[in-house]
From Swiss-Prot:
Annotated region (Interaction with FYN SH3 domain), positions in chain: 67-92
Protein name, UniProt field: SH2 domain-containing protein 1A
One GO term describing the cellular component: cytosol
Modified residues (N6-acetyllysine): K89
Lineage of origin: Eukaryota, Metazoa, Chordata, Craniata, Vertebrata
CDD domains: SH2_SAP1a (cd10400)
Alphabetical GO biological process terms: adaptive immune response; cell-cell signaling; cellular defense response; humoral immune response; natural killer cell activation; natural killer cell mediated cytotoxicity; negative regulation of T cell receptor signaling pathway; positive regulation of natural killer cell mediated cytotoxicity
Species whose genome carries this gene: Homo sapiens
Quaternary structure and partners: Interacts with NTRK1, NTRK2 and NTRK3. Interacts with CD84, CD244, LY9, SLAMF1 and FYN.
Compartment(s) where it occurs, according to its Swiss-Prot or TrEMBL record: Cytoplasm
Length: 128
């Protein structure tokens, strides 16, 4: 999971929400560890000023799935990156397609990116 750029590890729900709200962009998303269910992850998505959280888990056979809207057929993916790619498309059972990955930065240095926007020292937002 550490190889997934949007995975922030064991951050609190509040910290994840602050990171997403700081972007101000609907469709911004990140992955973090669930605080309440060990071994489960949370896919957090910003939409109209609210954070929507979807549980993501890995089956015993290694497949990945997300709990989406009721009535939406549960899909399984071989890799977490495939799950993220699928949810970048509309009508997948989440509030808005995943559009702007909020990546965890490896260095704590603030830089002037190629977009000319100063980046937060802990995250990097990439436009598609």
């Amino acid at each position: 999971m550490d190889a997934v750029a949007v995975y922030h590890g064991k951050i609190s729900r509040e910290t994840g929400e602050k990171l997403l709200l700081a972007t101000g962009l609907d469709g911004s998303y990140l992955l973090r560890d669930s605080e309440s269910v060990p071994g489960v992850y949370c896919l957090c998505v910003l939409y109209h000023g609210y954070i929507y959280t979807y549980r993501v888990s890995q089956t015993e056979t290694g497949s990945w799935s997300a709990e989406t809207a009721p009535g939406v057929h549960k899909r399984y993916f071989r890799k977490i990156k495939n799950l993220i790619s699928a949810f970048q498309k509309p009508d997948q059972g989440i509030v808005i397609p995943l559009q702007y990955p909020v990546e965890k930065k490896s260095s704590a240095r603030s830089t002037q990116g190629t977009t000319g926007i100063r980046e937060d020292p802990d995250v990097c937002l990439k436009a598609p």
